Regions:
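Class I (Rossmann-like) S-adenosyl-L-methionine-dependent methyltransferase catalytic domain
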Residues: 1-47, 65-72, 76, 85-163
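A conserved beta-strand element that flanks and buttresses the S-adenosyl-L-methionine
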Residues: 57
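Short catalytic micro-motifs in class I SAM-dependent methyltransferases
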Residues: 60-64
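Local beta-strand N-terminus motif with an aromatic residue
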Residues: 52-53
Length: 163
């Protein structure tokens, strides 16, 4: 809803069929497309909207992928971007000196076991350094009011091409 009148076309992807159906029902605009697709297996032939993309938004998904997969995703996404790209990443990070890895961890909030890798700032910056071209990087903490744990918190990374 925020983007439909600010762009020629919008493509939202998610691995969850249920979430894609909710998006289709709630955001039924001619220029908005939603697609079930794994972010780790992007192929231009499969996309409902043709590349190149000016803006890419990645939120809350990278904690579920291993390092090699994230490096591949960054490379694949970069190849789908226009030369004047903006990439926004919002992720939960470790506020410890090292990453925090949870495997088969029971969450009372989720009422289920889950796996996640909460990486450090430096680890994320290493991923971002894999983006081609002359870029600027802005980063900061957000959603302080949602910070329930001292070990983790939300951060954003705003990567822009410098032409």
């Amino acid at each position: 809803q925020v983007f439909h009148d600010k762009c020629d076309s919008y493509l939202g992807i998610d691995y969850s069929e249920d979430l894609i159906e909710i998006a289709k029902e709630n955001y039924n605009y001619d220029n908005c497309h939603f697609q079930v697709l794994s972010a780790s297996q992007l192929d231009t032939a499969d996309l409902l909207v043709s590349a190149p993309f000016d803006i890419v938004i990645i939120t809350g998904v990278l904690i579920y992928f291993n390092d090699d997969t994230i490096k591949k995703m960054i490379k694949d996404l970069n190849s789908l971007c226009a030369s004047n790209k903006t990439i926004y990443i919002r992720e939960t990070l470790s506020f410890l000196e090292t990453r925090l890895t949870l495997k088969d961890f029971f969450s009372e909030n989720l009422e289920a076991d889950y796996n996640a890798i909460y990486r450090t700032d430096d680890e994320f910056l290493d991923f971002i350094n894999g983006i081609d071209g002359n870029i600027t990087i802005e980063t900061g903490e957000i959603f302080d009011e949602l910070k329930n744990f001292t070990e983790t918190g939300y951060k954003y990374f705003l990567i822009k091409s410098v032409n």
